[in-house]
Amino acid sequence: MKIAVMTDSTSYLSQDLIDKYNIQIAPLSVTFDDGKNFTESNEIAIEEFYNKMASSQTIPTTSQPAIGEWITKYEMLRDQGYTDIIVICLSSGISGSYQSSYQAGEMVEGVNVHAFDSKLAAMIEGCYVLRAIEMVEEGYEPQQIIDDLTNMREHTGAYLIVDDLKNLQKSGRITGAQAWVGTLLKMKPVLKFEDGKIIPEEKVRTKKRAIQTLEKKVLDIVKDFEEVTLFVINGDHFEDGQALYKKLQEDCPSGYQVAYSEFGPVVAAHLGSGGLGLGYVGRKIRLT
């Protein structure tokens, strides 16, 4: 038995990790109103993306990997001698990535594809990838890995803040926000992932209060966990994320693992300006 681990590009793993563990990536893409399309790899730097999004008349659209892209990756790994592939995907609540990866797995012969819905995005999705790789190295079988990830999902989540809900509403990536329409003038929304979907949690007066709310909600959840990994996931307001990261490093118990990452273009397109996330995992994830 030989097991590969792959994911889509919204896990936002560093290139060092991708190279070290030979992780295959199925890229999502973004398209702007001028027709220019970029796959989520090295085709567009995140700073350039935010600048282009700010100057566009409409929000960019995003596309999941085509089934054919998944099939090509699966067949390549099969031809390299892999018998099983663990595939970690962006939440099915905001993307068709999981469904297309699963369907592609049904169409490929000679290799067993095990698609897993992270129900999250960004580096919290990436934590599932790193956990799966660790378990492969320890000799676990595919179903044992999927079972462990499923258990881990019960103690994993994320809260988000954005400047406004415009991008999320126009892209259809937020659930249950209708009652908030027209009520957010001078207010900042606090959001969370719930069962794979982004839903409104609270609205507060200032961005400072929103960040404090983000921190309090997550720390209240993890306070009884035996192990904790926290990820600050930053958007285009760089100083906000850096300040939160530094504060958590200073204030959290010594046993907490606090890490930092950034949103890539696809998730940033949905969140819009001012996105900032704080994710948590009830495990100590190997991050190197």
Swiss-Prot record:
Signal peptide: none annotated. Hexadecanoate binds at T62, S95. InterPro entries: DegV, DegV_C, DegV_domain_contain. Residues 3-282 form the DegV domain. Pfam families: DegV (PF02645). Keywords: Lipid-binding. GO terms for molecular function: lipid binding. May bind long-chain fatty acids, such as palmitate, and may play a role in lipid transport or fatty acid metabolism. NCBIfam families: DegV (TIGR00762), fatty_FakB1 (NF038249). This is DegV domain-containing protein. The lineage of its organism: Bacteria, Bacillati, Bacillota, Bacilli, Bacillales.
